[in-house]
């Protein structure tokens, strides 16, 4: 099972497993490298890369946040004629996914996702803080509106 897989459409998530026969191949798979599995994750001839290519996964990305295995932090491939070809980052060190319309970069140990317009997407903790800030802002606007109405 991949560490992370992405489809371009909704799939049944309550099954507990990925079913290629039902869902088809994911558009993009991410594997986070570890000392115990990196050779299998990076093996395009017998390992996961081989299996993912045979399944028709169009984009395959491996990420090493610690950079102990991959000094560059990310190694990725795109499927062409049934074989994975190296997928290089663009000049800004972002890997742009043709399949799902995002770009990924690695800054330090953190992967950063950008939307198709280049805007950085918020991380989980940032989302909670932004929601709290918006709630506070909304409460203040409601208070000002009530005050203006004379309530």
Give a label for each model feature.
Residues 1-55, 63-151:
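C-terminal interaction segment
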Residues 58:
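Short acidic/polar active-site loop segments enriched in Thr and Asp
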């Amino acid at each position: 099972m991949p560490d992370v897989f992405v489809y371009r459409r909704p799939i049944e998530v309550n099954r507990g497993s990925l079913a290629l026969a039902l869902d088809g191949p994911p558009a993009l798979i991410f594997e986070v490298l570890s000392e115990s599995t990196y050779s299998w994750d990076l093996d395009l001839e017998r390992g996961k890369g081989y299996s993912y290519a045979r399944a028709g996964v169009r984009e395959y990305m491996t990420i090493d946040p610690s950079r102990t295995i991959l000094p560059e932090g990310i190694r990725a491939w795109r499927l062409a004629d049934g074989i994975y070809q190296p997928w290089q980052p663009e000049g800004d060190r972002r890997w742009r996914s043709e399949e799902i319309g995002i770009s990924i970069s690695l800054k330090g140990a953190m992967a950063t996702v950008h939307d198709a317009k280049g805007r950085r997407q918020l991380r989980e903790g940032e989302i909670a803080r932004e929601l709290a800030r918006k709630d506070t802002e909304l409460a203040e606007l409601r208070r000002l509106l009530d005050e203006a109405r004379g309530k």
